Amino acid sequence: MSPVRRGETLPIYNRIAVLRAEHRLSRAALAEAVNVNMQTIGALERGDHYPSLDLAMRICDVFGLPIEAVFARTEFTPLSAEVYPSSKGKP
């Protein structure tokens, strides 16, 4: 089974695009840092491709973060929801 097919039932979400923006890295710069094509970074960000464990670890090393901070099986909470919690039902 291909990784994308497995991903239909077990998705892998990531924060690569957000982290790239925070670190002011282009797709090309991140691709060069982890030794892959720029198109691979785009496919990862869109969820069209899932990284090997080795690639996931190389990406995490670039950002200095543990793997669970960059990749997860459940969707990440939007940063805006963490920074600006909903005030519904509050006076």
Enumerate the predicted regions with their spans.
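Short, charged recognition helix plus adjacent turn
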Residues: S2, R6, D61, F71-P91
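Short alpha-helical DNA-recognition segment
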Residues: R24-A43
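Residue-level detection of the helix-turn-helix DNA-binding "recognition helix"
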Residues: A21, N35, R46, E75
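Generic structural marker for isolated residues within well-ordered, non-membrane alpha-helices
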Residues: I16, R27, A56
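Alpha-helical residues within the helix-turn-helix
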Residues: A21, E32, D61
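A short, Lys/Arg-rich alpha-helix, primarily the initiator
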Residues: M1-E22
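DNA major-groove recognition helix of helix-turn-helix/homeodomain DNA-binding modules
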Residues: D54-A69
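The DNA-contacting recognition helix of HTH DNA-binding domains
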Residues: R27, M38, D48-H49, I67
